[in-house]
From Swiss-Prot:
It comes from Bacillus licheniformis (strain ATCC 14580 / DSM 13 / JCM 2505 / CCUG 7422 / NBRC 12200 / NCIMB 9375 / NCTC 10341 / NRRL NRS-1264 / Gibson 46). Pfam families: TK (PF00265). Keywords: ATP-binding, Cytoplasm, DNA synthesis, Kinase, Metal-binding, Nucleotide-binding, Transferase, Zinc. One of its GO terms (molecular function) is zinc ion binding. The gene is tdk. The active site is at E89 (proton acceptor). Its main location: cytoplasm. ATP binds at G15, S16, M17, F18, S19, G20, K21, S22, D88, E89, V90, Q91. This is Thymidine kinase. GO terms for cellular component: cytosol. Zn(2+) binds at C145, C148, C183, H186. Belongs to the thymidine kinase family. Homotetramer. Its EC number is 2.7.1.21.
Amino acid sequence: MYIMKQSGWLELICGSMFSGKSEELIRRIKRATFAKQEVKVFKPAIDNRYSSESVVSHNGTSIVCHAIASPEEIFQYISKETDVIGVDEVQFFDETIVGTLTSLADQGYRVIAAGLDLDFRGEPFGVVPDLMALAETVTKLQAVCSVCGSPASRTQRLINGKPASYDDPVILVGASEAYEARCRHHHEVPGNPK
C-alpha cells in the first residue's frame, strides 16, 4: 500500500480583527520551516502598521515577508524550491489575488492566506468570500467581544470613540481610527440600511 502526499492546496484563515489570524499564519509558516520546507511570505504594500518588511501579529510575533503592490509580484519571488506560500491581509488585494492563489495551488504549492472575512460594516470583505469557497480548508477564528466577553465575529471601527458610519470608506489608509472586536449584538453601524 502506498501513501500519497497531496500536492498543492489552499488554506484560508479568516475572522475579525484581534482573532489571531496573523498569529495563526505565522505559526503555520514557522512549523513549515521546522520541517525544512522553503517558505515565502507576502503582504500588501499598503499594510505598514507595524513593519513594511514583516507580518506582525497584534501580540508581537512576526515573520519576514515581501510587501507587494499586486498579486502577480508573488511569481517574481518563488521558485521550484518553494514549498509554502503565505499571504497576510489578503482582503486588501484586488480580485486578481483569487486567480493567483488558485494557480499557485494548482502548480503544487501549499498556499496559506489570512484575512478579514467581514468589513467594519459586517459585510463580506473583498475577495475573501471567493477564497473561502475555493479553499480546501477554512479556519474561521473569533476574538472576544470588548463589550461583553462573548465570542466576537465582527470588527467595530471607532472614530473619536464613536462607531463609524455605514457611509465611511471600507478601506482607510493612514487614518486615526481605532478598532475593537465585537459580537453580533454589540456591533454598531449607524446608518446601516438593513
